Amino acid sequence: MGNLVAIVGRPNVGKSTLFNRLTKTRQAIVNEQAGTTRDRQYGKSEWVGHEFSVVDTGGWVVNSDDVFEEEIRKQVSLAIDEADVILFVVDVVNGVTDLDMAVASILRRTKKPVIMVANKTDNNELQYNAAEFYKLGLGDPYCISALSGSGTGELLDLVVGKFSKEGEELLDEDIPRFAVVGRPNAGKSSIINAFIGEDRNIVTEIAGTTRDSIYTRYEKFGFDFYLVDTAGIRKKNKVSEDLEYYSVIRSIRSIENSDVCILMLDATRGIEGQDLNIFSLIQRNQKGLVVVVNKWDLVENKNAKVMKTYEEAIRSRLAPFVDFPIIFASALTKQRIFKVLETAKEVYQARTTRIPTARLNEEMLPLIEAYPPPSNKGKYIKIKYCTQLPNTQVPSFVFFANLPQYVKEPYKRFLENKIREKWNLSGTPINIFIRQK
């Protein structure tokens, strides 16, 4: 189970700069293709063999310069709920403020590890100023400069040292892990209740290393599966989810710990920006996807044409990834609930598909010969062989070419589409690599 590090603090203390430093990104370099610019608030980091996720909880706040104490309190409460380690960023140039005091008063009550990061410490004189932050009662202020990177290596040593040393969950790897995700009021709780019904369907609860219950195993309708973080979805949330970044951050852990994500959409509202944010997280983590259009019972004049219009709109918004199942369901009336689980299991099986090398070459090489990669500066690109890589999270294929550097993304998409035409890989991402033969 991955660890989650949350960055909190009042506006303008350098949270975004620290986030960019830890995730080795710059805000100017953000992939806009996913249909959202909010990806920059969530990233992956790795330090001395430890992989973890980083969230800038303030990053989802619009006009963050105008954030008041109550908004900061919500962010910090969210971090306490969701994170394994909390980085509380303060500004040594401006010193202790009332908002810093307010944040510290909340953090002092948590049992989660809190590291106070004294940012903008660019010289020795400012290091002396950091002593002022002892009054916040959170231990030693850790001096860094997020802008120059000074002190961030030692900070990362401290962060990974705070991660739980307990063993990982003892999960049966052959049993699929499903996560139900979506924006507030899309019907997550309703569909989970429809899946599992009464508590007697619970087989085992496996305690997470840092959570009350991350995985719960169920046997229902002839299926054997884990639901990820259902306790978190079913409990009454301490933090209101009226603002979209709350539910997006809450989705991170569920997505990371799943094999297949069941993305709930509200049929009465269509696909919205928040749905795109969650879809982007699913894509970046390379998880299987089943889209469920819930509350289908509330749609009037339902027919095949209306259904087709919905499908086209969803695939258009989620492009370029369009090969995923869409199910029109009602958690309330239990319409097609069985179909949702059945499809999620099929997507899980697609993720583990193995295609024999001989068969792959037999199908793909004639296509490549008929439609070769475009030549580059008069040089012809030849692909002679392909194979599926072993032991990968999702189906991954390598094509060996004489000039791999000239094979561009559109041709990789062509290869992916042809593989999808030949084999049923609906719902699972696949990777295409071009290597020197």
Curated annotation (Swiss-Prot):
Give the GO biological process terms: ribosome biogenesis
Pfam families attached to this UniProt entry: KH_dom-like (PF14714), MMR_HSR1 (PF01926)
Ranges for domain KH-like come to 353-437
SUPFAM superfamilies in UniProt:
P-loop containing nucleoside triphosphate hydrolases
Q: Tell me the GO molecular function terms.
A: GTP binding; ribosome binding
Q: Where does GTP 1 bind?
A: 9-16, 56-60, 119-122
The protein's matches in PROSITE patterns, at most eight in alphabetical order, are given as:
G_ENGA
Ranges for the EngA-type G domain? 3-167, 176-352
State the UniProt keywords alphabetically: GTP-binding, Nucleotide-binding, Repeat, Ribosome biogenesis
Q: List positions binding GTP 2.
A: 182-189, 229-233, 294-297
Q: How does it assemble?
A: Associates with the 50S ribosomal subunit.
State the family it belongs to.
Belongs to the TRAFAC class TrmE-Era-EngA-EngB-Septin-like GTPase superfamily. EngA (Der) GTPase family.
Q: What is the documented function of this protein?
A: GTPase that plays an essential role in the late steps of ribosome biogenesis.
Name of the protein in its database record: GTPase Der
Q: What gene name is given for the protein in this entry? A: der
